[in-house]
Amino acid sequence: MSDTRRRVKVYTLNEDRQWDDRGTGHVSSTYVEELKGMSLLVRAESDGSLLLESKINPNTAYQKQQDTLIVWSEAENYDLALSFQEKAGCDEIWEKICQVQGKDPSVEVTQDLIDESEEERFEEMPETSHLIDLPACELSKLEEIADLVTSVLSSPIRREKLALALENEGYIKKLLQLFQACENLENTEGLHHLYEIIRGILFLNKATLFEVMFSDECIMDVVGCLEYDPALAQPKRHREFLTKTAKFKEVIPITDSELRQKIHQTYRVQYIQDIILPTPSVFEENFLSTLTSFIFFNKVEIVSMLQEDEKFLSEVFAQLTDEATDDDKRRELVNFFKEFCAFSQTLQPQNRDAFFKTLAKLGILPALEIVMGMDDLQVRSAATDIFSYLVEFSPSMVREFVMQEAQQSDDDVLLINVVIEQMICDTDPELGGAVQLMGLLRTLIDPENMLATTNKTEKSEFLNFFYNHCMHVLTAPLLTNTSEDKCEKDNMLGSNTTNTICPDNYQTAQLLALILELLTFCVEHHTYHIKNYIMNKDLLRRVLVLMNSKHTFLALCALRFMRRIIGLKDEFYNRYITKGNLFEPVINALLDNGTRYNLLNSAVIELFEFIRVEDIKSLTAHIVENFYKALESIEYVQTFKGLKTKYEQEKDRQNQKLNSVPSILRSNRFRRDAKALEEDEEMWFNEDDDEEGKAVITPVEKSKTEDDFPDSYEKFMETKKAKESEDKENLPKRASSGGFKFTFSHSPSATNGTNSTNSKSVVSQTTPASSNVASSKTTSLATSVTATKGNLVGLVDYPDDEEEDEEEESSPRKRPRLGS
């Protein structure tokens, strides 16, 4: 069947009560042997495949709506619809259905689903086929009419009969004439009755009645009737809003009068459904299903008509990107596209795909790049909404555009950088726009939705692009607010508080929390790229500065970032953390928190508990050797005692292993392992790295002679003990809380591996009896291995170095207290 009369779209209703487009084809009615009855067949116009094969069941309720729709249910939750291109085709198929069921084609519902008791009640009546007799349409009869309309809503058959009577007698237009009379006479009682009548007619759920009620001639009077809700002391002013406040603007003149009328109608009907009608109860939900379908098919038609008019869309894009276009006009154009994209969400996947491809072909992304950088907040907000539709539809399309753009533009004008800058510069105190943009960025950098083919790998290409061109823009606020210049300036001012660097501004803290959330996502999903970036920028150290923030949510974000890194159980990260002494700000935060049992306390404890349970040996050794004296007084959890136990067990195992190996073999093994690790780390850091800035942990330089490395464990321990005897001369200070306090100091030389006496953290302690000690010297707590001979700098944890560290004798210290 090739004629357009039988051309249809097949729809099914999904679980969300939205219509899914199953394809376009041609419908026919024929006898199907397998189904043993007359059936509706729809074959796809593209390849002739069978889209629908449905037997015309004598007991199925079919409905004809809007002259071109036939809707029915084949199972409890399986609704079908055929949308015809022409009314004639719909009428032909409707007659076939009615013929099979033995029904009159003039009736637009062939069956009613009623329960047995109601069916028995109607069977007892002598005549059930006659129409309901409507009272005369007069002012004096309004109460009677209202009672009639309200009474039929519980009966499907009576609803159908009333709808047919209203349609045949042109009753609705007569009622609306009475409405005008009641308003002129200020007849409040009559207006209240008309509200009940019109609301009840809407609940009849009849498409043919909607066509009358929502026509240009009637719709404003229908809205007027719905203003007079008896439950309200004063009537609403919906008509005033629709005629005066809500202005229809044609950004480009629409020459098609049918399209213009359809847009007006859809807006007003949507307003009735969303604003005027009360939220339906659970018993009324299905009463307005046809109204939902009416709006849905209107939107599909509007989008299709606009999409087919390429001249119209081309003109819109031309004006949107034209520098001569004034701001007001551009605002209208952007708002038009926002509404256009919102309407497109009613389309089914294949149609939506064609829609967005049309927009991409016309240049929607370059246009968005221009308008997102404008000063007008409303324009930027609308552009962000459009961008979100595009990212949701196809993140790959957006990624492809920005990578092509990078070959022709500077970093500052790249679309993704414009998006990041809009996120950073959001003026909303609650950062609503920034949160939305952060979600879009996360979608774009999510490897899970990146394509991988034999010819190219989108993941590799895009992540290289992002880290080379965009990451510095994203982290700029974080690095600025945790800069060492700020730290040094605050120290010069003599501030001894723990909040010298972190921003007190709530909005800035929120922004940094968003950035940290995105960086935490990168740690989980980007592996090599983010690892290289963290090492190069010493990013974790900068993030942990935020542990001092007065905003607990920001401190928790910083802690979560570190927790994700540790959760990877990657020894590169572990060495970076131990060599940088990066547990210090976390432990300081725990001690500063005192005895308060809150989220921060629990999160810090969980971090150390994870290390204990997962038995991460390098971190366990570092924590016990450097911080156990400060933590041993915390007895309300067994985490730290458990870490000490793990540490001692590992130490015993290493000692037993060491004692079982001859001295000469131990010496050779030390030398070989150090060299192997040294080469491995050099290879890793020499991989492709276009990032700016110096590596935080530089490759270990080859020693001039490997013989400079201690020949045995015993020789190295002599050096360590000599250092210990010097440290014992230093007296510890008292922290303000009465316990241990670590000062979080850092210098570039520390991160780059150069020897510095002040590059490590210090711990201070005193007792109440010695609180007025005149002076005290700082003492190093860090135990990174530093060779005393030659030029070898121990920036890498060699496996057997732990054995040496574990036998180090720490000077006795007093037990810290969490609060005094």
UniProtKB/Swiss-Prot annotation:
Residues 701-732 have a biased composition (Basic and acidic residues). Residues 798-809 have a biased composition (Acidic residues). Regulatory subunit of serine/threonine-protein phosphatase 4 (PP4). May regulate the activity of PPP4C at centrosomal microtubule organizing centers. It comes from Mus musculus (Mouse). Residues 687-820 are annotated as: Disordered. One of its GO terms (molecular function) is protein phosphatase regulator activity. GO terms for biological process: gluconeogenesis; positive regulation of gluconeogenesis; regulation of double-strand break repair. The gene is Ppp4r3b. One of its GO terms (cellular component) is protein phosphatase 4 complex. Residues 744-789 have a biased composition (Polar residues). This is Serine/threonine-protein phosphatase 4 regulatory subunit 3B. The modification Phosphoserine is found at S117, S663, S811. Its main location: cytoplasm. Keywords: Cytoplasm, Cytoskeleton, Nucleus, Phosphoprotein. Residues 1-100 form the WH1 domain. It is found in: Cytoplasm; Cytoplasm, Cytoskeleton, Microtubule organizing center, Centrosome; Nucleus. Belongs to the SMEK family. Serine/threonine-protein phosphatase 4 (PP4) occurs in different assemblies of the catalytic and one or more regulatory subunits. Component of the PP4 complex PPP4C-PPP4R2-PPP4R3B.
